[in-house]
Design a protein with these regions (language model features):
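Plant-biased recognition of short, low-complexity, intrinsically disordered N-terminal tails
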Residues: 1-15
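Helix N-terminus capping/helix-initiation residues
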Residues: 3, 47, 173-174
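Acidic (E/D-rich), amphipathic helical modules within compact regulatory domains
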Residues: 16-18, 22-93, 105
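EF-hand and EF-hand-like Ca2+-sensor regions
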Residues: 60-114, 124-181
Length: 181
């Protein structure tokens, strides 16, 4: 059973992605996020790069959020999201491997240049598309780049994602996964 702190972080993540601000997650929220990323990068409407960015975010819906839609209405409520997250991370022994698999599309949507690493600019664009300030995005990246090499690897990303949801430590670096908490 998640602690109150863990529930708060889970709700924060859910509402960050709820870009339509209607209390549910749908494919349109991820499509909107893709357009926000493209806007932040000044990619014009109709440009092939914009479509690639939006498609990557639609893939996040399909791989990460849609499996939590237990009633098949193409919408994910906070309760459905909480149950999906609890299922993903209920076994800490294999949660890192599962996070690598489940979060591949999320990582790929942030890794805009496709080099297999996320740099500070890419992470800032991701967080800013979710409404996080530039200053908080900078702090978040510094916290999540656990080896200090200037990049977040797939392993660092997966570990931080798992720790974000399972850690009950208010000082854990992973708490910054979605910006300040």
């Amino acid at each position: 059973m998640p602690s109150e702190f863990q529930k708060r972080k889970l709700a924060l993540a859910f509402y960050k992605y709820d870009l339509s601000k209607d209390g549910i997650l749908e494919a349109k929220d991820l499509e909107l996020q893709g357009h926000k990323v493209a806007d932040l990068l000044k990619v014009k409407q109709g440009d092939a790069e914009r479509e690639k960015i939006v498609s990557a975010h639609k893939a996040v819906w399909d791989a990460y959020f849609k499996p939590g839609d237990t009633d098949g209405d193409n919408k994910v409520t906070l309760d459905e999201y909480a149950k999906a997250v609890e299922h993903y991370y209920s076994n800490p022994g294999n949660s890192h491997e599962l996070a690598l698999e489940v979060n591949k599309s999320v990582f790929d949507s942030i890794d805009l240049n496709g080099n297999g690493q996320i740099d500070s600019v890419e992470y800032a664009v991701f967080l800013r598309s979710l409404g996080v300030s530039e200053a908080d995005a900078k702090v978040a990246f510094e916290r999540l780049d656990t080896n200090g090499d200037g990049y977040i690897s797939r392993d660092e990303f997966a570990k931080n994602q798992v720790d974000y949801f399972i850690s009950d430590d208010p000082e854990a670096a992973a708490n910054w996964f979605y910006g300040s908490y």
